[in-house]
Amino acid sequence: MTAVIVEDEIPAGIRLERLLNQHEFQVLVVLNSVKKATAWLKENKHPDIVFMDIKLRDGNCFEILDKVKIESKIVFTTAFDEYALNA
């Protein structure tokens, strides 16, 4: 199963990538901003699943979803419960 991680905190991205690799996911890329994620998702075949942090350094992941129709399953990874209803 292929995956993309959208996470701006480097240690969190590394931990998630390691965890996914242990469970036979192929992590295609770890992206750390709305801008990079939007560009990558517009230019590449979408993975089976996208793991997205909600708060990123240059905005939030909902901006990505407004710009790109993502055909993948999405798992939101965040410590902020105020985003639960939006997600």
Locate the predicted segments by residue:
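Extreme N-terminal starter segment of soluble prokaryotic enzymes
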Residues: 1-3
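Conserved SAM-binding loop
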Residues: 5, 30, 76-77
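Acidic, metal-coordinating helix/loop segments flanking the phosphotransfer/catalytic sites
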Residues: 17, 30-49
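Structured loop/turn residues at beta-strand edges in well-structured enzyme cores
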Residues: 23-25, 44-45, 70
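CheY-like receiver
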Residues: 47-87
